[in-house]
């Protein structure tokens, strides 16, 4: 089956490499080069990235769950900005979308805007999860995949399958 459009889910932990937290630039640059190789084959790529290299709401017993999930959403934005910039370094054009206004860092998500970005040959990042607490980035992955009519979801994470709870 020829795939024209895919949605890639990267775990935040994948960005940390052996450091387990933050970013490991060599690891992320290698991932960016692999993404570019797929893109160079003519495949349109959407990407959702988790925030687990910075924050996991379930690890805090003192912070309100809504606030914890908001911190997680912000972590996904940081991850998308970082990976997007390394993808640009490899020669790709990128765009980052969020489900809520995030100043000049991202564009507000709409299917029409995303379709325009794909038509312009851009790699599209979906940051901020669903924009609502209590939903993992795995939920956001499936939601965005359906919305963009992806041919497949590709998972690059340290867990077999998807989270059905956090």
Residue ranges and their predicted role:
Residues 1-44:
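N-terminal glycine-/serine-/threonine-rich phosphate-binding loop
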Residues 7-11, 49-50, 97, 126-128, ...:
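Short beta-strand segments
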Residues 14-16, 52-56, 103-104, 132-133, ...:
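Short, active-site-adjacent cap segments at secondary-structure transitions
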Residues 27-29, 67-79, 144-156:
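Gly/Ser/Thr-rich active-site loops/lids in small-molecule metabolic enzymes
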Residues 39-40, 81-91, 143-151:
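Alpha-helix C-terminal capping segments
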Residues 42-46, 121-124:
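Loop/turn-to-beta-strand initiation segments
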Residues 60-124, 139:
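Ligand-binding beta-strand-loop-alpha-helix segment within the catalytic cores
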Residues 112-164:
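Internal active-site segments that recognize and position negatively charged phosphoryl groups
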């Amino acid at each position: 089956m020829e795939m024209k459009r895919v949605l890639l889910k990267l775990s935040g932990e994948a960005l940390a490499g052996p450091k387990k937290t933050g970013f490991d630039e060599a690891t992320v640059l290698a991932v960016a080069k692999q993404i570019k190789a797929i893109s160079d084959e003519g495949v349109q790529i959407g990407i959702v990235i988790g925030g687990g290299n910075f924050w996991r709401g379930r690890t805090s017993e003192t912070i309100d769950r809504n606030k914890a999930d908001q911190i997680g959403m912000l972590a996904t934005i940081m991850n998308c900005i970082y990976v997007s910039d390394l993808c640009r370094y490899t020669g790709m054009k990128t765009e980052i979308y969020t489900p809520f206004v995030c100043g000049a860092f991202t564009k507000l998500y709409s299917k029409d805007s995303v379709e325009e970005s794909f038509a312009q040959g851009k790699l599209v990042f979906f940051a901020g999860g669903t924009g609502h607490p209590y939903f993992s980035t795995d939920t956001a992955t499936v939601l965005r995949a359906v919305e963009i009519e992806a041919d497949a979801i590709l998972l690059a994470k340290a867990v077999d399958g998807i989270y059905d709870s956090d």
